[in-house]
């Protein structure tokens, strides 16, 4: 395994650990999710170019589009939560409340 792939896997693992550790605030969770998606995007692009799989060259761009949609929905949820409750705690996002 090359050092670039190892670094990207470590970046993904650190972002995943950040999601698990800093899950009390929505903003920190969203930042860690963006780090995970960015490391997946770079890893997919490098693997596709390394193995010359040009038929799958649109996969990283599709992942990037879904990442942008996820960020937009997450930021809208962050704005709505901070307007309603005054903070960005994840514990305020209870689905049982109407």
From Swiss-Prot:
Where exactly are the transmembrane stretches of this chain?
Answer: 1-21, 28-48, 59-79
Q: Name one GO cellular component term.
A: respiratory chain complex I
Where does this protein reside within or beyond the cell? Answer: Mitochondrion inner membrane
Q: Name the keywords, alphabetized.
A: Electron transport, Membrane, Mitochondrion, Mitochondrion inner membrane, NAD, Respiratory chain, Translocase, Transmembrane, Transmembrane helix, Transport, Ubiquinone
Q: Which InterPro entries match?
A: NADH_UbQ_OxRdtase_chain4L/K, NUOK/Mnh_C1-like
What's the catalysed reaction?
a ubiquinone + NADH + 5 H(+)(in) = a ubiquinol + NAD(+) + 4 H(+)(out)
Task: Note whether Membrane occurs among the keywords.
Answer: yes
Q: What is this protein called?
A: NADH-ubiquinone oxidoreductase chain 4L
């Amino acid at each position: 395994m090359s050092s670039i792939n190892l670094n990207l896997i470590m970046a993904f693992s650190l972002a995943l650990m950040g999601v698990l550790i800093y899950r009390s605030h929505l903003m920190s969770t969203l930042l860690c999710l963006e780090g995970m998606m960015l490391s997946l995007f770079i890893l997919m692009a490098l693997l596709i170019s390394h193995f010359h799989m040009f038929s799958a060259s649109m996969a990283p761009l599709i992942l990037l589009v879904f990442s942008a949609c996820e960020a937009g929905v997450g930021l809208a949820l962050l704005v709505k939560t901070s307007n309603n409750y005054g903070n960005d705690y994840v514990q305020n996002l209870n689905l049982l409340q109407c």
